[in-house]
C-alpha cells in the first residue's frame, strides 16, 4: 500500500469498505457504481477515512450477497483488513467514462441550487438516493431559500427541466407546497 494520495478535489467516492471477509485479508465493499461490479474495473484506489489517505491496488474481487469481496495488494490477514473498515474508496475523476450531454454523475448534481418554475429557490441538492423506481434528490434549504423545509424530488425528466453546471443551478417543475 502506498501513502501518496491523489489530489483531494480530484477524487470521487465510488464505494466504501464496511467489513472483513475470512482470515486472508479480504474486505467487504459496498460499491456505489452501477452495476456494482464496475468498481472492479479500477485497479488503483485511494482510500480515505478521518483524515487518513492511502493508495491501494486491487488484486481481485467478486460479487457477494451484500456487495463485493475484494483482495488488496499487501493486505494479508484479517487484523490488517479490519483497520480499513469505514474507509471510502475513491478514484480520480479523470478515470470516469464520459457521459452524453444530457447525463450527469451524482457528484455533479450535489451542491446545485434548485429553483422551480415559479422562480422559488428550494435549496441545494445535498445528496441523492437510489430507489426502485427512480433516483431521488434530497434538497436542503440554504441562504435565500423559500422556507426551511427539506424536500425530496424525483430525478426524472418530468421534474428536472434543466441543469446548468456552470451556473450551479437546476430548474425543476415542482410545486412549492409539496
UniProtKB/Swiss-Prot annotation:
Plastid as UniProt keyword: no
A biological process term (GO) from this entry: rRNA processing
Gene Ontology cellular-component annotations: cytoplasm; ribosome
SUPFAM superfamilies: PRC-barrel domain, Translation proteins
Single GO term (MF): ribosome binding
Compartmental location: Cytoplasm
InterPro entries listed in its UniProt record: PRC_barrel-like_sf, PRC_RimM, RimM, RimM_N, RimM_N_sf, Transl_B-barrel_sf
Residue ranges annotated for the PRC barrel domain, each copy included: 101-178
Keywords noted in UniProt: Chaperone, Cytoplasm, Ribosome biogenesis, rRNA processing
Top-level division of the source organism's lineage: Bacteria
This protein's record includes keyword Metal-binding: no
Oligomer status and interactors: Binds ribosomal protein uS19.
Listed NCBIfam families: 16S_RimM
Similarity comment text for this entry: Belongs to the RimM family.
Function recorded in the entry: An accessory protein needed during the final step in the assembly of 30S ribosomal subunit, possibly for assembly of the head region. Essential for efficient processing of 16S rRNA. May be needed both before and after RbfA during the maturation of 16S rRNA. It has affinity for free ribosomal 30S subunits but not for 70S ribosomes.
Domain-level remarks: The PRC barrel domain binds ribosomal protein uS19.
Identification of the protein by name: Ribosome maturation factor RimM
Organism field: Pseudomonas putida (strain GB-1)
Designated gene of the protein: rimM
Amino acid at each position: 500500500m502506498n501513502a501518496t494520495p491523489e489530489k483531494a478535489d480530484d477524487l470521487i467516492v465510488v464505494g466504501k469498505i464496511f467489513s472483513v471477509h475470512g482470515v486472508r485479508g479480504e474486505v467487504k465493499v459496498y460499491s456505489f457504481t452501477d452495476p456494482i461490479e464496475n468498481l472492479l474495473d479500477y485497479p488503483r484506489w485511494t482510500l480515505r477515512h478521518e483524515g487518513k489517505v492511502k493508495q491501494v491496488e486491487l488484486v481481485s474481487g467478486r460479487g457477494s450477497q451484500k456487495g463485493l469481496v475484494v483482495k488488496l495488494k499487501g493486505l494479508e490477514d484479517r487484523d490488517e483488513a479490519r483497520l480499513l473498515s469505514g474507509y471510502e474508496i475513491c478514484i480520480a475523476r479523470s478515470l470516469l467514462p464520459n457521459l452524453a450531454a444530457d447525463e450527469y454523475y451524482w457528484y455533479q448534481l450535489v451542491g446545485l441550487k434548485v429553483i422551480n418554475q415559479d422562480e422559488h429557490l428550494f435549496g441545494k441538492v445535498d445528496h441523492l438516493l437510489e430507489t426502485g423506481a427512480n433516483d431521488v434528490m434530497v434538497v436542503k434549504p440554504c441562504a435565500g431559500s423559500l422556507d426551511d423545509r427539506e424536500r425530496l424530488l424525483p430525478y426524472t425528466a418530468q421534474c428536472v427541466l434543466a441543469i446548468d453546471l456552470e451556473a450551479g443551478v437546476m430548474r425543476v417543475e415542482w410545486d412549492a407546497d409539496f
